[in-house]
Amino acid sequence: MNIKPLADRVLILPAPAEEKTIGGIIIPDTAKEKPLKGEVVAVGHGTKDEEMVLKAGDTVLYGKYAGTELEVEGTKYLIMRQSDVLAVLG
C-alpha cells in the first residue's frame, strides 16, 4: 500500500524500542517507552504558507505524544505535522 501524506504532514516509521537496558536487563513489551525517533518515509507537498523541510530518509526526533498511530500491512507508522518534529538527526 502506498501512503501519501497531505499538506504539511509526514509519515514516520518509528525506530524499534530498546530491548535491553545498558546494564543488560531485558525490558518487557509492557514497560517499553514509546520511541521518540524514527525515519521519514513520505512527506506531503506542504502548504502555501509552509514549505516542506523534511524529506524521505531523514531521521528525526519528535515529541512523546506527537502524531497519530496507524498500522498498514502489519507495520506501525506515525503520521504527524512537520511542526511536531523537533529535530533532524545526522
Swiss-Prot record:
A cellular component annotation (GO) from this entry: cytoplasm
Ligase found in the keyword field: no
Keywords, comma-separated and alphabetical: Chaperone, Cytoplasm
Subcellular localization: Cytoplasm
InterPro entries assigned to the protein according to its UniProt record, in alphabetical order: Chaperonin_GroES, Chaperonin_GroES_sf, GroES-like_sf
Record GO biological process: chaperone cofactor-dependent protein refolding
One Pfam match: Cpn10
GO molecular function, one term: metal ion binding
CDD domains the UniProt entry points to: cpn10 (cd00320)
Stated family: Belongs to the GroES chaperonin family.
Oligomer and partners: Heptamer of 7 subunits arranged in a ring. Interacts with the chaperonin GroEL.
Physiological role: Together with the chaperonin GroEL, plays an essential role in assisting protein folding. The GroEL-GroES system forms a nano-cage that allows encapsulation of the non-native substrate proteins and provides a physical environment optimized to promote and accelerate protein folding. GroES binds to the apical surface of the GroEL ring, thereby capping the opening of the GroEL channel.
Protein name in the entry: Co-chaperonin GroES
